[in-house]
Amino acid sequence: MSVPTVLEKIIARKLEEVAERSRRIGLAELEQQAAIADPVRGFAAALEQRVNAKEPAVIAEVKKASPSKGVIRDPFLPAEIAAGYEAGGAACLSVLTDIDFFQGADAYLQQARAACSLPVIRKDFMIDPYQVVEARALGADCILLIVAALDDARMHELAAVAKAHGLDVLVEVHDGDELERALRLETPLVGINNRNLHTFEVSLETTLDLLPRVPKDRLVITESGILNRADVELMEINQVYAFLVGEAFMRAEQPGVELQRLFFPDRARSRGVVADPE
């Protein structure tokens, strides 16, 4: 028997978690909570506005820990981080809510969203319609669908539930086969994860290799591995203007200032922030 990958372990735990949560709060009650949640803020629209202007559309991540790196930020203050990201020029937020592997929490999403006016994606491993409704009840504006974690039927089902609740969908891929499956969804948002979710190794070539296969009517977000100004410029030269970045910001003393330094160096210099030497 082969050893389960990190992703397989996460999905196995997520199945248990959904069962536990649905016993505590039934779907009907959750639907009622979703119906009275704050209106959605337009996640896809915020990215499209920046990308159409060829400006960096940064999805800035609020993340305490990861399976590969352990605790990344401590103390961890989601509201303070979110406000800093907005001041630094982020287009959207990504907030980890997975508890067991990323030390996330639903409350972190609520705290971050309340501290700013940016649209927020619930960054979690979505495998069941219950979680989609839960995302809207928490106030999320978008959900993540990871192709590697879903079969086609479930992926389309979750996308339909998201649409019914006014949520945007970011579909995430890592290779050509996953991209082919992802493009069957209606969503314009295609995230290319430079991190292999089975091995957690990172290569920016993943985005560059898959980019020619993405239709022009889709918006590509490059995810993971953007660590310095050279990485940003490499993507922009290849007409990729949307980025999901977490660790590079989370390790900085002031995440919002680091965002500005990486993506808006002219603005950062005018405020006395030292530019990235790379």
Curated annotation (Swiss-Prot):
The keyword Lyase applies. It comes from the Bacteria. It catalyses: 1-(2-carboxyphenylamino)-1-deoxy-D-ribulose 5-phosphate + H(+) = (1S,2R)-1-C-(indol-3-yl)glycerol 3-phosphate + CO2 + H2O. Keywords: Amino-acid biosynthesis, Aromatic amino acid biosynthesis, Decarboxylase, Lyase, Tryptophan biosynthesis. One of its GO terms (biological process) is L-tryptophan biosynthetic process. InterPro entries: Aldolase_TIM (IPR013785), Indole-3-glycerol_P_synth (IPR045186), Indole-3-glycerol_P_synth_dom (IPR013798), Indole-3-GlycerolPSynthase_CS (IPR001468), RibuloseP-bd_barrel (IPR011060). It holds the Pfam family IGPS. Pathway: Amino-acid biosynthesis; L-tryptophan biosynthesis; L-tryptophan from chorismate: step 4/5. GO terms for molecular function: indole-3-glycerol-phosphate synthase activity; phosphoribosylanthranilate isomerase activity. Its EC number is 4.1.1.48. PANTHER family: INDOLE-3-GLYCEROL-PHOSPHATE SYNTHASE (PTHR22854:SF2), TRYPTOPHAN BIOSYNTHESIS PROTEIN (PTHR22854). HAMAP family: IGPS_B. Belongs to the TrpC family. This is Indole-3-glycerol phosphate synthase.
